[in-house]
């Protein structure tokens, strides 16, 4: 998917693309390196951000989902990632590793960067700090 927000196909995608950029910038400030944005496997799924997390002992490949949601009775951004969505992300990550075997030896982790907006927040208070959840869910039997 193009990195230029004006090329995204819907207002929802353009809005989400803005949060993905904020998330990517935030994670880079934490020392992660962005490898890919909006990586897609046709008919399987898309991963918002794929990053390398350099650590002292080994590097970790991070597949990150970015979610923004208004807090409501239906839960926050983190809770919006259903088991079905997790399975789709895991399946897409497997395709990424098949297409990029040079990363296959790395430890892998699924993170979420969540943005929760309070319902009724004024525009002046609309900016939301990202909540970074490392290892938000696990893949069984890679």
Where are these regions (language model features)?
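Acidic-basic catalytic patches of nuclease active cores, encompassing PD-(D/E)XK
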Residues: 1-38
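Conserved catalytic cores of phosphodiester-cleaving nucleases, focusing on short active-site segments
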Residues: 27, 47-53, 57-71, 89
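Short acidic/glycine-enriched loop/turn segments that link adjacent beta-strands
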Residues: 42-45
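Mg2+/Mn2+-dependent nuclease catalytic core
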Residues: 69-93
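Metal-dependent nuclease catalytic cores in nucleic-acid-processing enzymes
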Residues: 90-102
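Domain-level recognition of nuclease-like catalytic cores that cleave nucleotide substrates
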Residues: 100-142
């Amino acid at each position: 998917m193009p990195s230029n927000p004006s090329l995204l196909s819907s207002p929802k995608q353009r809005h989400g693309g803005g949060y993905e950029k904020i998330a990517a910038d935030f994670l880079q400030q934490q020392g992660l390196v962005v490898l890919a944005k909006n990586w897609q496997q046709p008919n399987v799924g898309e991963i918002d951000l794929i990053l390398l997390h350099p650590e002292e002992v080994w590097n970790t490949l991070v597949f990150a989902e970015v979610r923004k949601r208004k807090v409501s009775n239906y839960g926050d951004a983190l809770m919006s990632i259903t088991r079905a969505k997790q399975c789709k992300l895991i399946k897409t990550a497997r395709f990424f590793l098949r297409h990029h075997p040079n990363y296959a030896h790395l430890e892998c982790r699924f993170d979420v960067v969540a943005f929760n907006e309070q319902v009724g927040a004024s525009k002046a208070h609309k900016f939301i700090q990202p909540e970074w959840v490392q290892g938000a869910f696990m893949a069984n039997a890679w």
